[in-house]
Amino acid sequence: MLQQLLLVSVLVSSPPSGRDVIKAMHDRYAGKWYRTLSFVQQNTATRPDGSQQHSVWREYAALPGKLRIEFVPPDSGNGILFVNDSQFVFAADTIGNVSAFIHPLMVLGFDVYLDPVERTIARLERLKIDLAAVHEDTWEGRPVYVVGAKPGDLRTRQFWVDRERLVFVRLLEPGQRDTTRTNDIRFNKYQPAGSAWLSAEVAFLVDGHERWLEQYTEIKTDRVLTDSLFDPRRWPARSN
């Protein structure tokens, strides 16, 4: 408790480092964050001409570090598995592609509360986020810490954290295919989940225009999920 109070004092009295912010996030919810999560995800893709396409996914997470996405209908065998900082893409229950991938939204939205602080820091450094660059700003009327960029810089890869709740709310980064564009990912509509929090909507914008929206329903936390759901060798295993 004393250590947590000292850390809060540092955050309040002086500009924190990115390490301070990560440690504060971890310590605030130590032993309180849910270990599993499942939900139905309603997707809306918006094309540049304004037309939309809708889809449904089912997702299961075992935290830290494991996420299973099943494209509906589940028996299609299509989906994606994230585990051990790797991405497995499945088509008709067969692995089509495997690649190394640190999922930044998993790290910042979930794993940060359960992984050791040093592991989170190491993963963020591998994602090329400058943890020494920190400033304060306001987002949706609430004060936030911005880690990874200087004031006024909305191009460099950076993440935003609600200063009071210590939850991740925003990620900005150059586009992966076109680095002249800016990707803006927002965790919206936070709601209590026991003693923790859950964002029930995630928006993906490109240069200020929404291109993908995820809305979560049938949300369940700390439900028992079998290990087979997250084993790429046993992808056909499905949860009901």
List each model region and its residues.
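Gly/Pro-enriched, hydrophobic low-complexity segments
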Residues: 139-236
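A short, sequence-level motif marking secondary-structure junctions
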Residues: 59-63, 84-87, 104-107, 162-164, ...
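Residue-level marker for the onset of beta-strands and adjacent loop->beta junctions
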Residues: 55-56, 65, 76-78, 133, ...
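Short, surface-exposed linear segments at secondary-structure transitions and domain or protein termini
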Residues: 63-69, 89-91, 109-112, 169, ...
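Flexible, processing/modification-adjacent segments and terminal tails
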Residues: 14-23, 33, 86-155, 175-181, ...
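Compositionally biased, intrinsically disordered low-complexity segments enriched
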Residues: 5-6, 43, 160
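N-terminal mature ectodomain segment of secretory-pathway/periplasmic proteins
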Residues: 14-96, 128, 132
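Sec-dependent N-terminal signal peptides
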Residues: 2-12
